[in-house]
Amino acid sequence: MAEHGESSEDRISEIDYEFLPELSALLGVDAFQVAKSQEEEEHKERMKMKKGFNSQMRSEAKRLKTFETYDTFRSWTPQEMAAAGFYHTGVRLGVQCFCCSLILFGNSLRKLPIERHKKLRPECEFLQGKDVGNIGKYDIRVKRPEKMLRGGKARYHEEEARLESFEDWPFYAHGTSPRVLSAAGFVFTGKRDTVQCFSCGGSLGNWEEGDDPWKEHAKWFPKCEFLQSKKSSEEIAQYIQSYEGFVHVTGEHFVKSWVRRELPMVSAYCNDSVFANEELRMDMFKDWPQESPVGVEALVRAGFFYTGKKDIVRCFSCGGCLEKWAEGDDPMEDHIKFFPECVFLQTLKSSAEVIPTLQSQYALPEATETTRESNHGDAAAVHSTVVDLGRSEAQWFQEARSLSEQLRDNYTKATFRHMNLPEVCSSLGTDHLLSCDVSIISKHISQPVQEALTIPEVFSNLNSVMCVEGETGSGKTTFLKRIAFLWASGCCPLLYRFQLVFYLSLSSITPDQGLANIICAQLLGAGGCISEVCLSSSIQQLQHQVLFLLDDYSGLASLPQALHTLITKNYLSRTCLLIAVHTNRVRDIRLYLGTSLEIQEFPFYNTVSVLRKFFSHDIICVEKLIIYFIDNKDLQGVYKTPLFVAAVCTDWIQNASAQDKFQDVTLFQSYMQYLSLKYKATAEPLQATVSSCGQLALTGLFSSCFEFNSDDLAEAGVDEDEKLTTLLMSKFTAQRLRPVYRFLGPLFQEFLAAVRLTELLSSDRQEDQDLGLYYLRQIDSPLKAINSFNIFLYYVSSHSSSKAAPTVVSHLLQLVDEKESLENMSENEDYMKLHPQTFLWFQFVRGLWLVSPESSSSFVSEHLLRLALIFAYESNTVAECSPFILQFLRGKTLALRVLNLQYFRDHPESLLLLRSLKVSINGNKMSSYVDYSFKTYFENLQPPAIDEEYTSAFEHISEWRRNFAQDEEIIKNYENIRPRALPDISEGYWKLSPKPCKIPKLEVQVNNTDAADQALLQVLMEVFSASQSIEFRLFNSSGFLESICPALELSKASVTKCSMSRLELSRAEQELLLTLPALQSLEVSETNQLPEQLFHNLHKFLGLKELCVRLDGKPNVLSVLPREFPNLLHMEKLSIQTSTESDLSKLVKFIQNFPNLHVFHLKCDFLSNCESLMAVLASCKKLREIEFSGRCFEAMTFVNILPNFVSLKILNLKDQQFPDKETSEKFAQALGSLRNLEELLVPTGDGIHQVAKLIVRQCLQLPCLRVLTFHDILDDDSVIEIARAATSGGFQKLENLDISMNHKITEEGYRNFFQALDNLPNLQELNICRNIPGRIQVQATTVKALGQCVSRLPSLIRLHMLSWLLDEEDMKVINDVKERHPQSKRLIIFWKLIVPFSPVILE
């Protein structure tokens, strides 16, 4: 170690790079890139953190305490980290060694903290076993007194002499002053930081900053003559009373303990490991193969215990396994050879010189074992004590000591360590759970305050009558057995104060049994015996030094009198009792308790710890489990008890395939199997309890109720006093007038509800079936099925019967037709609180719908199909469900990945019913759009001058850019770490060869991608070959088409559409496109390139139906179209953006030859000579959509032909100007004939302004109108006309009303409009924006009117009001309205304008 208090911080690496390829495959990301970025961030954090020896964290118990707020979803337990010298720093998840200052941020599944510590800082003096002041978590302050102080006792009567003894006082104990210690009568012994009173001989150590030597002296040795000469009896009593923990305990209780101590171990060593005790390891070799050439004793001495499989042994410390033993093998040598870093081996090496000294110093009498030492103080002192006792007193003393020995022997046997679990959990005994610390909170009966306790703190505070409460399987039994085991093993000095510890199971006793009889029957076995008289005398004499661990408590009435008295009249015996009680039963004994300990949920790191030990031979399996729970955070709590962990271990052992599933339902099923095995004798009552609890769970789930009262239980037929009920539910009474009941967890409630629903739907009774259908039909939207009730339905499918499955499948697949449910989706808030991950899922689906309802519908349909097929296959009812499935598939567009479903392998003909399948190929090229939106609009604008309270209406573009750049960087980093995922074509339909049916239409979306690699090309070749028709949509993906040329060459005749945006086509790609004979649709947009070679040869696409050309820079597109272009007689859609120089006659000629034209979009600035264009358009009777962008024509020429377009659905003229009133009136009159019109974007101009009211009235004759836009033409009179028309019953289908940029409307006009607007049941979007020069500052009455207007629009989800200057009070009104709105979760208000300047603040 460097100088104490200093530590050099070199760059270190926590990453196991050799395992990163494997991790990359499991996570689906580039783990090398993630690791590199993570290491850099962690190095920066390390450089900021304080270094140097931290004397305040010498105590392992204190280090353990720092992990109270530590994330439980980790691979290392706090116990492992604290034992390895680490404490939690509070900086992220960083832990730091108190000695060498090593800082670690990550956890490793394959390396324990001690191993990581050893690898990164082998020079750490703590690891090397040097004296750096470490205090073991179970260590105590009281030490064995030295037989002779240095220089004799007499020389230390003077304080100065005592002070001189502290010359070599260790550096780590400088927080306690030698002067204060010497003043309190202590002399430094020269060993560690141990001091001894010159007067009473009391010896103390483990001094920490803030300790008061006088207080410690008074607590542990209150009879000391020197102490009593310096402090009054009142002061001594105050010291004792204010001492934390160890009530009624003095140093004498530790010094004269009968417990045999194991030889000391290196402090970094985890000294409470189950098999640290040699006897325990020896006990595991009972079934060791007799033919093995290696002796058991040698294996045990080398640290190994038998795994029970073949001749495989495992080290209790490092977990290393060895097998295939041969003649002459030396276990210790092999241990050193294969696992040289093992801490146990390091311990032996470090103790090589210490052990002989210890053995000689603490030599045992010949009558006792040589490997242990009797720790009841000086032998002569004990002998004299016995001599002074009377004959009968001596008898109880001898019997008590003999009993103590028998108890310790019993607690270290395998029969005690193994729990009596049924065969479902037989593979996992208590052995694997004893080393796990349960999470405990302490609740003082007379105070409402709760406090989290570490196990050392629990041990320090054991006194009087206490209980440990918890659910079934929460670890109560394991906890009590661990206390007994640690006491017996000699590895826990905190428990030395107890001379007798009785672990008694109350489930196997009768009320007429005596206490001695119970102890003999349960703990002493054959030949063991103790009389009631001697037992009573021992308890009477030892009092606080007797600990009863009472398990399986079920009530006072069933207890024998002796135990009843110990609990209810503890003041008589003054013994210590710790009673394990189910949460439901605590109230029964609350009156007699001083403190209640409550076991919390089993931390996930304990689950990992158990599984790592149990499946050390298959650590990848444990890695997969952790990754599964990273992806499914909502499910992390299912391992809430050790019993559930036992269930998953058993399931993994019995079913190897289960290791890849990690399904939470398996846990619950295993738990229910455990209950059925345990309660075989009462199978019918158990089934009745499960059924009634299932009914309660089902009712609660559909009413979002997860807490119940007695009335709820009674209504469901649940007997709250039935013991079996406590196996499924918990009762909570603290701080409540009436008890509250909860299931073991929200997920477990859903599981039981699922069991009940299946039971109802499968019943022969019509009433049950009807009730089941009633609940099923409450899942009345696709979003509920795939979100709120997704987990529940998954549980139902795991129990689905042949009778129930078709009913569920039919219901689920009909939900996709519920269009309204998607548009009006809202989350169940109570459910979301319990399942935060579900809320994120909901937000994703809702966001997808807002952006693309079509994509959302496809996404939802896919999930409903997957769910339905799970039901069909789990229940073997595919044939019965197929009619519903086939009907569902008809006309659907789904993702390509659905073909991996088994159904498409079994029924490939169903593929023909689909409309299309979609596949997306996404790269990591980024395309920024920031500058395009602002460059031209703001360049001539001056910053607005406004009052200071309105500044929040503007956001500077630099801030917006900064946030945008940050988001862009996050996305870029995310994309970079995720390798391009290939479309999965490994299962289902793809297993068929040859393919009996082809994909009707394949839609290929390619985004931000460069050239395809060979792997992707191979996939596309197979997918293309299985497709009848292929459509491409390419965005920002230059070069991609050329890279997939081999795949296109094989499927030329299948490509029917190619849409390309923001990319440039190479000459090779243009030539490739020209070889596609079946191309029907071609779109090129948002690029400066004019692909002349392609356009010159468009006539070669004989089947072309759609052409869309929107190029930046407005090149003369018409000039490059071939003369033969009019020969494409099938053209249905023509969308052209061209320049003013274009030859208009050429366009006219084209249209003349397109009799089937449905859609015509033109963007240009012709202004004149457009009569011929209008004439030819008038002949296109099938036109459904017309859009003119730019000033394309003289108004009257178009108005004259407008009545011809009787099939028109979309008319977009918002860029056109109608200057005169006559033309505008004629336009308004013509609108009335467009009965099928759905979208109308009204032109601008003075003429339109004058007839705006007439246009509004004419729109009332358009019953299909969904979108209505007025820009720059409305005033107060015309805008109120819209409100009146709506109120009178017009515009019933209107979804989007855009009246933005109408600066002739005054504040009064807006206020009147808001007050009058009503009766628009389907309006989803309202736009009232203004530009910056036309910004409006309104009064409170106008804001109030707007709020009232919004309240009357029940479907509104977007309100645009840029350049409305609103202060804090105004926004409060708007937000209050939003909170109360029916669409409050979806309603978005756009009011903040992004600008490239800061507004001028008026003085």
From Swiss-Prot:
Signal peptide: none annotated. Zn(2+) binds at C315, C318, H335, C342. One of its GO terms (biological process) is negative regulation of apoptotic process. The keyword Nucleotide-binding applies. Changing F844C: Strongly reduces production of IL1B in response to bacterial flagellin. GO terms for cellular component: IPAF inflammasome complex. Keywords: Apoptosis, ATP-binding, Immunity, Inflammatory response, Innate immunity, Metal-binding, Nucleotide-binding, Repeat, Zinc. It comes from the Eukaryota. PROSITE patterns: BIR_REPEAT_1, BIR_REPEAT_2, NACHT. Residues 464-759 form the NACHT domain. Detected in macrophages (at protein level). ATP binds at G473, S474, G475, K476, T477, T478. Changing L840R: Strongly reduces production of IL1B in response to bacterial flagellin. Gene3D superfamilies: Inhibitor Of Apoptosis Protein (2mihbC-IAP-1), Chain A, P-loop containing nucleotide triphosphate hydrolases, Ribonuclease Inhibitor. SUPFAM superfamilies: Inhibitor of apoptosis (IAP) repeat, P-loop containing nucleoside triphosphate hydrolases, RNI-like. Pfam families: BIR, NACHT, Nlrc4-like_WHD, NLRC4_HD. SMART domains: BIR. PANTHER family: BACULOVIRAL IAP REPEAT-CONTAINING PROTEIN 1. Sensor component of the NLRC4 inflammasome that specifically recognizes and binds flagellin from pathogenic bacteria such as Legionella or Salmonella. Association of pathogenic bacteria proteins drives in turn drive assembly and activation of the NLRC4 inflammasome, promoting caspase-1 activation, cytokine production and macrophage pyroptosis. The NLRC4 inflammasome is activated as part of the innate immune response to a range of intracellular bacteria. This is Baculoviral IAP repeat-containing protein 1e. It comes from Mus musculus.
